[in-house]
């Protein structure tokens, strides 16, 4: 999910395994869950509720950057010449118009 062009979400002391557990926990413990960040931190393991909330805030900021066009789409190269170029541009336009819920 994270890349070098994004903020520190997915980097630092968060392992890939912890990030996956974090993402799963967010799906289980929604914003209406009492003690959400305590539950998320417990599901991740080795993180405090404050660290879980900070990681969430970074994720939200990254998503907003993507939605606002601040993170460029990769320039994928095709091996068949320009035959897929139009489709890639259409996909890029579609992705730019999408808003994540």
From Swiss-Prot:
**All copies of domain SANT, residue ranges:** 9-64
Output the lineage of the source organism.
Answer: Eukaryota, Viridiplantae, Streptophyta, Embryophyta, Tracheophyta
**InterPro entries to which the protein is assigned, alphabetical:** Homeodomain-like_sf (IPR009057), RADIALIS-like (IPR044636), SANT/Myb (IPR001005)
Provide the species name. Arabidopsis thaliana (Mouse-ear cress)
Decide whether keyword Oxidoreductase is in the record: no
| Function as written in the Swiss-Prot or TrEMBL entry | Probable transcription factor. Required for female gametophyte development.
Q: Which residues form a coiled coil?
A: none
Q: Does the keyword Transport apply?
A: no
Q: So which tissues is this one expressed in?
A: Expressed in the funiculus of ovules and in embryos. In young ovules, expression is observed in the adaxial side of the funiculus (the stalk connecting the embryo sac to the placenta). Also expressed in heart-stage embryos, in the cortex and endodermis of the hypocotyl region but not in the cotyledons, shoot and root apical meristems, provasculature or epidermis. Not detected in young seedlings, mature roots or in young floral primordia.
The molecular function terms of the Gene Ontology recorded here are: DNA-binding transcription factor activity
User: What PANTHER family would the database entry show?
Assistant: MYB FAMILY TRANSCRIPTION FACTOR-RELATED, PROTEIN RADIALIS-LIKE 2
Per UniProt, the keywords (alphabetical) are: Nucleus, Transcription, Transcription regulation
Q: What does the record list as GO biological process?
A: embryo development ending in seed dormancy; gravitropism; response to red light
Residues of the region (Disordered) are 69-101
Q: Where in the cell is it found?
A: Nucleus
Taken from the UniProt entry, a GO cellular component term is:
nucleus
Q: What else is known?
A: Assigned as a member of the MYB-related gene family, I-box-binding-like subfamily.
Question: In its UniProt entry, what is this protein called?
Answer: Protein RADIALIS-like 2
Q: What happens when the gene is disrupted?
A: Endosperm development arrested.
Q: Give the chief site where it resides.
A: nucleus
């Amino acid at each position: 999910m994270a890349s070098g062009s994004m903020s520190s979400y997915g980097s630092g002391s968060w392992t890939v395994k912890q990030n996956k557990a974090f993402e799963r926990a967010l799906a289980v413990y929604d914003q209406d869950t009492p003690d959400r960040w305590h539950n998320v931190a417990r599901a991740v393991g080795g993180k405090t509720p404050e660290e879980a909330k900070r990681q969430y805030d970074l994720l939200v900021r990254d998503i907003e950057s993507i939605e606002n066009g601040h993170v460029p789409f990769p320039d994928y190269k095709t091996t068949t010449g320009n035959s897929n170029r139009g489709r890639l541009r259409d996909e890029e336009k579609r992705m730019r118009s999408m808003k994540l819920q």
